[in-house]
Amino acid sequence: MNYPDPFIPQRADPYVTKGPDGCYYFTASYPAYLNVDAGYDRIILRKSETVTGLSTAEEITIWNAHNEGVMSKHIWAPEIHYISGKWYIFFAAGEKEAIWNIRPFVLMCQGQDPINDKWIEKGKMQASEGDDKSFSEFSLDMTYFENNGKHYLIWAEKLGDSSLFMAEINPNEPWKLINKPILLTKPEYDWEKIRHRVNEGPAVLKTEDKVYVFFSASGTGEEYCMGKVYADRDADLMDKANWTKDSEPALQTSDLIDQAGPGHNSFVVDENGNQLIVYHARPFSHFDKNCGSYCDEPLYDPCRHARIKLVTFDKKGVPNLK
């Protein structure tokens, strides 16, 4: 198994999924170059019959940011999911007039071809009735998974610290929560509090008996790293007591060669049955200001590259990212 490294340059928050047509789809944050007005302004897709083919596949823009108002700035971390027979994209966006007013939004494809068919806006993600907290503050990085016939969304929201919350949805209306969320994880350990106190970028990996939620922590520079929480698949996932959190990072800069700040990942099984992690990380040359588009503010530096690693499993079936 040999994948290009970087897999796709300048594509942070990479997300790869396999569709019902057997093809693989890739999306990611389209980068900003040095400032907020030079990027983060569209949603892109790639399609290939193989994971490897995504690295050179044509990149299509399927949606552009609005000129003003909601969904006009900071278009971040899109994820494409096939839910109840339809394609959806969850993404975060701010406003030209308030660029940090970040909230999650939803697009729906009107056909079965996400590359060529029309996408329509379903608007901002909606909380359940009586829930006046969800999406009331800076919130982003929404992901979806199904387990035992129930459908869940996980996202990051800054209610104090940036923490992860989870709630259920009706798969026929995945732009609405159907219950109040639980707090899944918040920054607790030193490695989650470097530069910023952050848990974000959730990614779900299911094994035969467990649900693992990997997440990214700390600031988005060299300190960026990944942790995990997990629960039994047969447990009540909406009961916080059923989740366990590891006290050490699952993947960090010291685990990699010539890569720094690994995070905001997704998981996919390739055409040969290999379990992969797709993540972004900067090259160490970035910190020597050799990237060509260096910026002191990590968010506006495009040198976060999409990369791929093989996930291994120990004798108990626990995933290992290192």
What spans do the regions from the language model cover?
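Carbohydrate-active catalytic/glycan-binding domains of CAZyme proteins
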Residues: M1-K322
